[in-house]
């Protein structure tokens, strides 16, 4: 579901859509919401990070004030049509003393395009520890803007530091931010982080990636450890874990510029390398 696929864009659409617009949902009866199509994207299919963020936003609108998203797991089941609205149906699995669990189905024409499970918690002070540290990379202020396909579509800015590990087609380590200001609501900001989390792929560092073609997302999990502001520069650092059975999996971390670990993520994608008959023995 990455925006870095070889998607056909409508060049006549020149004004990027804001992420804030994407997260504006129309409430419907019975814990349902509607996300209207955003025609200015110029896309034929929906970016997976968009619908995941919209589903998480819908869930957040059904929990008590003060409960903030801390994890989500989405399955991408069908490609979505960017010209059509999305209906988001929320199921209230549990509301406990501190935690709330939700499931969300995103549908178009009664067909599920995404299924998401997520959890919210009332913030609490606790032990602070992170084993992974911000990589030693150039700060965004020393870099020039990198043109992602997504930057033509949404109000995003990317900058790519020098990377000692080679990558193919998609940068696997990059600074990202949302340009237009999001509300200070911590759940809206969490949705903004989720929106950014699916823009590239750690499989760009995997062996034989140049033979794999498109690598649409199958499922995507994000754990939100600390509050962050996606209007500030965030470093997304992605690394492959392995490929097998026509699929690949990678993990990643998202840091703020000060080095705080804001989120961790894991994604499985298609990784279909054509079988070479000459390799048979």
Stretches with model-predicted labels:
Residues 3-281:
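Terminal targeting signals and extreme-terminal segments of soluble enzymes
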